[in-house]
Each structure stands twice: as structure tokens, then as C-alpha cells.
Amino acid sequence: LGLAVPVVQVVASGRLLKLGVLVKAPDALERLAQIDTIVFDKTGTLTLGEPKLTNVDTIAPDDLVLAAALATRSNHPLARAVSAAADGVSLPTLTNITETPGFGVEGEQDGETLRLGSRIWTDAEGPAASGPELWLRRGTNAPVQFTFADLLREDAKAVVNHLSKTYDVVLLSGDQKPVAKSVAEELGITNWAAEQTPADKIAKIDTMTKAGKTVLMVGDGLNDAPALKAAHVSMSPASAADISQTAADFVFQGTHLGAVADTLSTATRSRSLVFQNFGLAIGYNFIAVPLAVMGFVTPLVAAVAMSSSSLIVTLNALRLGLKSGTTPWTR
């Protein structure tokens, strides 16, 4: 009876480790098996998080180096793309640089305030890009637009389609509405919201929780960390910001989103095996103890039977490690 739960947890954690998923909390699998709603971030979670700057040829060199100087203080995928576009170029020294998660980075050069970030953060009024975007504002000058392309993870559509059959799938993105809408439509996600700040994401998760939903949050950015903590259980890719990995209950390696589905499947099967093990152990004792009291079971037989019951529970848990057929995504 004492082995019913721990042996399943050990086998499940070992199986997930082979799949490149680290289980960080002892009760994480149990909580994951209870969820009915999955909330995805977009950039770096549904996408590869390796955006490329697409309009670099139309950006003035001075604007690019200033943007890169600000971007070096952020771990956001779009900021990394700006830094990569200015690789090898000498960057100016800025002062009073601060990052506001979910909005952007601010600094000063010769008394002039510089901001690199979202449309709202920079008070930009230009046309929205068809993909992710950042804006650079220099003092009172008109903001300069930086546009990016970020590919979806190879298995994102198949995984979302698979999960949608069992769970409510939600997309909460910090990007502009056209970008979030495009990704949601491509993946078949009907419940989505754009221009979400960290506070907005927490509010959405709290609303779902109060409505009786049990939420899994999957995100990678610095601005996702509060939402990861607010959710019932959370997952983050290994490429995520350190604070997001710290906040998450699971961390998965690689570029495949299938790790999320595999972890959910493992958690569900683990819970089923725990109940089976309890049933086997209790049923065994329910039958064996009365027989022993009535003298039908000798001490030798009882000793062998006790060891056998532990073996049965262990072997039942080991079934979790057996391959359960093919999955509809690339691993």
C-alpha cells in the first residue's frame, strides 16, 4: 500500500526525463492530471522564438544601433533579433536603462529618452504589421517600426488539434490583434486575446479559475512568469527566460510542442495507475487479512504473498514506461 503512489511518480518522472521533460514539483503530475484548460503564450511557445528582423534595409543605421543598444538589456526573442541584426556594429552607451515586462525597454542618450517596445509603450500610430513588431521612439520623434517573422513550431498545429479534443485551448498573446488572430486561425484556436500585458494574463487566468476551470499555463517569456505562477500548473520550454523556468512546474527540452501533450498523457495515465495500485493493494489486504486471521494463511505464505503484492504494484506502475502507440506529431 505504501508503494502505490511513489513508485508511479518515480516511473512517470523517469519516462518524462527520457522525453526531455523535467518535473520540478513533487505534486506537479497530480495537479496536471486535473486540468481542463490550456493557456498558451505565442512567441517562443507556439512559435520557435527565433524571429528574424525583416525590414532591416528600410531602417536608418542610427535607429538600428540605438534599438540594439536597448535590446541588449532584454531577453525577449524580438529584442534578441534586433541585437542579431546589429551584430558586429559598435553600440552607443546608454544610461538609465530599465525594462518593463510586457511593454519594452527604456533608456537615455545625452538627455534624450529612448523607448523600444510595443505600440502602446511607444505611442505609435503607424499601420500594424502582418507579423510581430517593435517600435523605437527617440524623444518626440515619430516612432520607427521594426517588423519580424517568427515560424510556428513544426508540430504546433497537430498538437493543438490533438489537445483541443480534450481540453479548452486558449491563446493569450502580447502581440497586436492581426498577428494573434493570424496565428489563432492557423492553429484552429477560437478562444484568443491580443495585446495582453502580464497583468492581463493573470486576470484572464483568475477569471477562468473563478469560473471553475483548472488551468495549465504554457509560456516562456519574462512577462509570462506571473501567469505561470498564477495557474494551477505550468510548463515552460528550456529556452525560456530563467525566471519563467523557475516559476514553471515542468520544463521541456527541444523545439517540439509535443512535449506538452506527452506530459499531459503521462500525468493522466499516472493518475489512473495510482488508483489501480490503491485498488490492488486494498483489495489484496481485504481478502488476505481475514484469511490469515482465520488461519488459512501460514506465516510462510503470508511473507511470500506480501512480497508478491509489492511486486504486483511495481509491475503495474512499470506499464507506464511501455510505448503506447504512435503520436500525431514529430518527436
Where are these regions (language model features)?
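Short gly/pro/ser/thr-enriched loop/turn and capping motifs at secondary-structure boundaries
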Residues: 29-30, 47, 54, 200, ...
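Short, conserved catalytic or interaction motifs in soluble domains
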Residues: 3, 15, 34-37, 51, ...
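Hydrophobic "anchor" residues
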Residues: 45-46, 142
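Conserved ATP-binding TGD loop and adjacent catalytic N/P-domain core of P-type ATPases
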Residues: 23, 111, 132, 138-276, ...
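Short hydrophobic-aromatic micro-motifs
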Residues: 113-117, 236-237, 314
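P-type ATPase nucleotide-binding
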Residues: 53-162, 166-167, 177, 186-204
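Hydrophobic alpha-helical transmembrane segments
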Residues: 1-42, 70, 163-166, 183, ...
